[in-house]
């Protein structure tokens, strides 16, 4: 304890992102179109290895762990992994970056395991545009996931990739999500 990591600009590093899978249940055109080669499951870090890495990171001053993917919720045991990481001394916060499709379905387990916050990738509120961007008709599931997280008291941030001539006219609608709910919206180019 007591050791810290400093980046090249003299800033203390307090968080770490861990990608637990490259698999995803969507095929977003800017991220993972069809035909992408996937890593063999045997080449992924085991949850025990991830937990060990988080223990070492905590000893080096890491306080926040961000679980990402691919889509982390497609990996069996993701919710339990969050609980294991939350038990590590020094880890104060665990967040999840997700496309939100499986979020409502797994919300109670995520809450039981101590998830602090969720970042949800959502580029449009138009069902047609959503299917165009992601290759799947799953917008309804994402909106249910957002609502489930808000109702559970989990901090919610929406990450939206702006794409000219596809969803650039929807900025206002996406911002509207945050108008009456405790949701932050962040636009990404």
PLM segments and residue spans:
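Short, Lys/Arg-enriched N-terminal segments with co-localized hydrophobic residues
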Residues: 1-4
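Radical SAM/AdoMet-radical enzyme domain recognition
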Residues: 47-66, 74-178, 184-186
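Conserved G/P- and acidic residue-centered "switch" motifs that form tight phosphate/ATP-binding loops
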Residues: 71
